[in-house]
């Protein structure tokens, strides 16, 4: 009976997000800026904290980072991400554990002038209150995610535009 209940709760708490961003910057620049995780707080207001578990400057396979994110609504999520696979200028995937459990996948497609980034985020919340509130709070969780992504993309684009105007 408990297994059935857990399966039901898991299905109600599965979130699949698929976001596509078009960046007016060359693929190489977009890739390098996005992998420079230490600079994320400068352009991503929703990122409260990010720190490596180990010594590294740019993300590569096996790296482990901890982060805390807070959107518009009065809660934050903390999770660890471990880089699972990386193909330079093309693909990045990672697993997350903590307040969220799941995976993120980024595909990059670009040219000398622009970059398309497709970000897939498949996660389950692990916080009990989030799991129990899913039947009525799901739209708020989705909206919060969308607002965080919108702000992050806007901040990333502004940062790229500023660097390219210098």
List the predicted regions and their residue ranges:
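Hydrophobic ligand-binding cavity/cleft-lining segments
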Residues: 1-60, 166
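A short, structured loop/turn motif at beta-sheet edges
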Residues: 27-28, 55-59, 84-89, 107-116
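Hydrophobic pocket/interface hotspot
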Residues: 30-34, 40, 65, 83, ...
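Glycine-rich portal/gate segments that line the openings of hydrophobic small-molecule binding cavities
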Residues: 51-100, 151-166
